[in-house]
């Protein structure tokens, strides 16, 4: 996991069934159409998560041919286009997803993360806040984490901290929120709280170069030479070719 970037949530495969037909025949036809759409959406999402982008695109195109305005089909197609770095198409499909169902929290979340990634921070946070306000949405911790990361880019540390703390209130072991709270605390000169957050991070997640370098900086600020040396050794041993390992001598006054 790259904790320095926005976290894209697992794709929700719930397709909203909307409306009632005026006759049994039309109801049956609509139900058939929805089932076909849902099947292609689920297949497309599965292929996307496995990195099989071409096959995922084919399935999602079939879903959209069947139901062009389906919110979840457009949402997942938007994520696919984002992965393909076709940002214009991603934006178009995200807008269609929200037009199809403005209360789809998965679409609001993914679109908000996309906007933050593209530098549209205020608009991104607005969509993330809409997703976070849905009490039935199972990824509210991740939404708050993404909003916090987005606001750190602005930068707006006080508001970012509010979202990150909300994420930890929902999930006290959420690694990204722990890491970014450690970073926020360290950046504001609060090295002791930063130590607490980074220690909790290591208890709930695997080592990463970014987290180990931050831990080295924190212990350097706290003048704990033993802890600093221990984290530095882990960084050099586990990630010897990482940029973070190369930064040790400048980041915390350590020899190459």
Whereabouts are the PLM-identified features?
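Terminal, low-structured helical/coil segments at or just beyond the last alpha-helical repeat
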Residues: 27-28, 34, 203-256
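Register position in tetratricopeptide repeats
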Residues: 49, 83-84, 117-118, 134, ...
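Helix-start (N-cap) detector for alpha-helical repeat units in TPR-like alpha-solenoids
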Residues: 30, 36-38, 71-72, 105-106, ...
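Bacterial Sec signal peptide processing site at the extreme N-terminus
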Residues: 17-36
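Structural marker of alpha-solenoid helical repeat scaffolds
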Residues: 32, 66, 99-101, 134-136, ...
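Canonical tetratricopeptide repeat
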Residues: 42, 76-79, 110, 144-146, ...
């Amino acid at each position: 996991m790259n904790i320095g970037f926005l976290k894209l949530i697992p794709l929700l495969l719930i397709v909203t069934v909307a409306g009632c037909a005026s006759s049994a025949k039309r109801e049956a036809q609509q139900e058939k159409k929805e089932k076909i759409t849902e099947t292609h959406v689920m297949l497309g999402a599965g292929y996307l998560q496995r990195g099989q982008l071409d096959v995922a695109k084919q399935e999602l195109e079939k879903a959209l041919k069947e139901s062009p305005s389906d919110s979840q089909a457009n949402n997942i197609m938007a994520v696919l286009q984002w992965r393909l770095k076709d940002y214009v198409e991603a934006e178009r499909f995200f807008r269609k997803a929200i037009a199809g169902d403005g209360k789809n929290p998965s679409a609001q979340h993914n679109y908000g993360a996309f906007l933050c990634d593209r530098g549209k921070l205020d608009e991104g946070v607005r969509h993330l806040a809409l997703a976070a306000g849905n009490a039935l949405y199972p990824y509210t911790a991740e939404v708050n984490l993404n909003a916090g990361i987005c606001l750190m880019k602005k930068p707006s540390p006080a508001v970012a901290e509010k979202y990150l703390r909300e994420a930890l209130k929902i999930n006290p072991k959420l690694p990204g929120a722990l890491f970014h709270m450690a970073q926020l605390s360290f950046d504001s000169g609060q090295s002791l709280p930063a130590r607490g957050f980074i220690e909790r991070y290591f208890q709930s997640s695997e080592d990463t170069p970014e987290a180990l370098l931050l831990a080295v900086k924190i212990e350097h600020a706290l003048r704990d030479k033993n802890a600093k040396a221990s984290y530095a050794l882990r960084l050099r041993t586990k990630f010897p070719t990482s940029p973070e390992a190369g930064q040790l001598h400048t980041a915390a006054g350590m020899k190459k």
